[in-house]
Amino acid sequence: VGNLLISSLALEKNGYDIFRKYPALFKASYAMLKYSFPNLTVSAFGDTGRASQSAESLEIGLLGAVKYNQAELPEMLASMKKLIDGGIYDRKKSGFLGLLCYMPEIPEAKTNYQWPRTGTLEFARFFLQRNGTDPKTGLMVGVQGATYNHNHCNGMAMELYGLGEVLGI
């Protein structure tokens, strides 16, 4: 998704309304945080590695949200604040892409990020439930069981989060 978003950024900068034409691509720029454990990492979905919300993707999405006056802008700003406050992202290290393409300043988030207590990633058949969002005291369970999405040969995968760690898979 990251490379598609970078390509979309180039097209947007040259007058093509890619995010308006393909709203799912815009939504992909900020989707991962809502599936994250309280330590800001995402489920391994069976056999993949652990990732987190891409700050680069979120920066590109913020450009689209501002340009098209999207209702998601406050949530996206709160997501970016969460990544910066959590030590996941430092804008000073965004390189040439950040220097040449990102907004000069990120507008101040007026709200904190609101973690959904429960959620579903439908295509992956991933279901989550949280109890608290503090990285040390929060709890979360994620269960995934799609037949085509990185699952183990033994069927369903479950991850438990507590005490700041993913405790099982």
Predicted regions and their residues:
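Extended polysaccharide-engagement surfaces of secreted carbohydrate-active enzymes
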Residues: 2-169
